[in-house]
């Protein structure tokens, strides 16, 4: 990229900065949840909603982000995303109750939902096609560093300052990013088709109310009848979307996508698989602090091997899938992740803390292999005219399933635990043991889906966007 103009390189730095902010925030909060609970006078069992409110908002807003960027301009939307994310961070730091914090996290989520996809779109518009891969590698590298630094930085800030600082550090960075965006980024626009507002609202309502209903009466404070009403509303909304999208060329996501078998299997497996794996980044630091008595900083440091294992495995995952095929790799990594989850629980409860970094490193390797395999399987056989829509749907499902996973983890803690648990409680480790056993079972379930994947070991990883028209 050395032959790119200076202005373009600065624009790539701005996009990379946005990726870093968004990825850092997805992990920096996890180690602070027990301290937040104590400060806000809440049970740690309720704090999973701090993560859910952010991730679910990202899932809901993702389908609209690309259309907004084309309609209003990439600079305007990227600037708006940074401003909303920064304001959300400020309101998070000022929150005095859990409900205030959840609303502020949702505002952060609106900004986060627009930041990454609009950043990708910006790179497509400012960089020549032949340099696109190199440019995307450059801007996504900070996004890989964010999860590495997040847990330890969050623990450090909580232990030596307060949890408010995990949000306050975003403010000066966000101000600089917003000013740089206005000064340096061009405002590309494109002619857009009419936005499928009806489909967007139906999907948003369906995803939001079903996730809320999953939290149960203990988590939401709602009666069983109200929970049943939420489930009914969510199911009706999703059924109405299916009816709306049938034979509708303007639908947010065309049902023609599901005529491709690998897409259907990959999407179903990704949804189920990320529900299980989405529990781990939330449960691990909470368990280390509340269940084992680790300090926030120590718990954050323990998460680093998992990220390192994930990053290291990305270098060889292509060769692994080419050698063994999607079915074998996905079934093996799904069952393997379940076993590693049990190994982590057993090692921790036995007090073999020196072994935990190695177990978490292994967990990161297995999880990374499964993620990469799920993503390429889902998209590899889509025709060109459905590839963009399929990628957007996969991105939405990834965020939705992670929010559901965290919700279920919180629900399990609530089912097995009392209203308040602490390190001094004699039943705390038993509560976590039952929760981890349940998680291991849930993580293993998608193996039944992946067992139906054709085991084509040739040309597995090349995303063959066959130039056939969708029928």
UniProtKB/Swiss-Prot annotation:
Cross-referenced PANTHER family: BLR6921 PROTEIN (PTHR42718:SF46), MAJOR FACILITATOR SUPERFAMILY MULTIDRUG TRANSPORTER MFSC (PTHR42718)
**Which positions, given as ranges, span the membrane?**
12-32, 49-69, 77-97, 102-124, 138-158, 165-185, 197-217, 225-245, 263-283, 286-306, 342-362, 396-416, 431-451
Q: Under the GO molecular function aspect, what terms does this record hold?
A: transmembrane transporter activity
Query: What subcellular compartments does it reside in?
Result: Cell inner membrane
Source species: Shigella flexneri
Gene Ontology cellular-component annotations = plasma membrane
| Record carries keyword Secreted | no
Q: What protein name does the entry list?
A: Putative multidrug resistance protein MdtD
Similarity section: Belongs to the major facilitator superfamily. TCR/Tet family.
Q: Which gene encodes it?
A: mdtD
Supply the alphabetized keyword list.
Cell inner membrane, Cell membrane, Membrane, Transmembrane, Transmembrane helix, Transport
Q: What is its main location?
A: membrane
Q: Which residues lie on this side of the membrane: Periplasmic?
A: 1-11, 70-76, 125-137, 186-196, 246-262, 307-341, 417-430
Topological type in the membrane: Multi-pass membrane protein
Database matches in PROSITE patterns: MFS (PS50850)
Give the Cytoplasmic compartment stretches of this protein: 33-48, 98-101, 159-164, 218-224, 284-285, 363-395, 452-471
